[in-house]
């Protein structure tokens, strides 16, 4: 999949889909907003935020 720009609820929904039952930590301090909203990130990078 190509890199995507995901912001707000779209970013949270993507994390739900990718992480599933593992859950994830969504905190602006982790840099996920800079990485995936201000820039683009891959599904592989999103998976780094799963628990």
From Swiss-Prot:
It holds the Pfam family Insulin. This is Insulin. Belongs to the insulin family. Heterodimer of a B chain and an A chain linked by two disulfide bonds. It is found in: Secreted. GO terms for biological process: glucose metabolic process. Gene3D superfamilies: Insulin-like. PANTHER family: INSULIN, INSULIN/INSULIN GROWTH FACTOR. GO terms for molecular function: hormone activity. InterPro entries: Insulin (IPR004825), Insulin-like (IPR016179), Insulin-like_sf (IPR036438), Insulin_CS (IPR022353), Insulin_family (IPR022352). Keywords: Carbohydrate metabolism, Disulfide bond, Glucose metabolism, Hormone, Secreted. Insulin decreases blood glucose concentration. It increases cell permeability to monosaccharides, amino acids and fatty acids. It accelerates glycolysis, the pentose phosphate cycle, and glycogen synthesis in liver.
């Amino acid at each position: 999949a190509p890199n995507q720009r995901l912001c707000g609820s779209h970013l949270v929904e993507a994390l739900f889909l990718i992480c599933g039952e593992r859950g994830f930590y969504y905190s602006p301090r982790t840099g996920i907003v800079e990485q995936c909203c201000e820039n683009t990130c891959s599904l592989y990078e999103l998976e780094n935020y799963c628990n």
